[in-house]
């Protein structure tokens, strides 16, 4: 299995320590729980970044980092039909934050596979930096990543 993470070049060395998610929280974790967010494809990782463009997050200076996950590594998967109604809404976050934070604390697995809110039939992979099996993953060197400018422009009429 492969995972991909897009991040600012200046954070590449610490992209998988979960510190950003610990400090600010995320869809699948409460503030205080360290976790690294990745996607099963580079395309989904791109979309997951683009949904934050309106939040003022700059997209220049990004790098893509590929992660190889051994096939025999236990991965917990959560399917969309296992989630509470409304899980894709912004106000549906509390249940997801609790679910993810409990998984982090349980150390049940190093990887949690969760449906993307953007495309529920595709998956993001949460990596638990405190799990001993994280050492079994292969983290590749960051590669420069540039967003196609057409993704960021207004449609012309």
Q: Language-model features: where?
A:
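Active-site and NAD+-binding cores of ADP-ribose-processing enzymes
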Residues: 2-17, 58-157
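NAD-dependent ADP-ribosyltransferases
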Residues: 5, 13-29, 36-37
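Small-side-chain structural scaffolding
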Residues: 20, 36-39, 45, 100, ...
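Glycine-rich, charged/polar anion/phosphate-binding loops
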Residues: 21-22, 50-52, 97, 112
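Short, flexible, solvent-exposed loop/turn segments with mixed acidic/basic and small polar residues
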Residues: 23-28, 55-57, 115
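A general marker of short, structured functional hotspots
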Residues: 24, 33, 141-143
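Short, well-structured hydrophobic secondary-structure segments
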Residues: 30-78
């Amino acid at each position: 299995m492969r995972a991909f993470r897009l991040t600012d070049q200046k954070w590449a060395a610490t992209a998988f320590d979960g510190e950003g998610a610990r400090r600010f929280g995320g869809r699948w974790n409460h503030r205080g729980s360290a976790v690294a967010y990745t996607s099963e494809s580079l395309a989904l990782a791109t979309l997951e970044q683009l949904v934050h463009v309106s939040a003022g997050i700059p997209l220049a200076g990004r790098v893509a980092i590929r992660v190889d996950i051994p096939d025999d590594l236990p991965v917990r998967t959560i399917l969309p039909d296992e989630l509470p109604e409304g899980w894709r809404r912004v106000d549906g976050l509390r249940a997801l934050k609790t679910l993810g934070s409990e998984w982090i604390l349980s150390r049940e697995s190093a990887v949690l596979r969760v449906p993307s809110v953007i495309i529920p039939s595709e998956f993001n992979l949460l990596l638990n930096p405190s799990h001993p099996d994280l050492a079994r993953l292969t983290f590749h060197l960051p590669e420069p990543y540039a967003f196609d400018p057409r993704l960021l422009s207004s449609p012309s009429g």
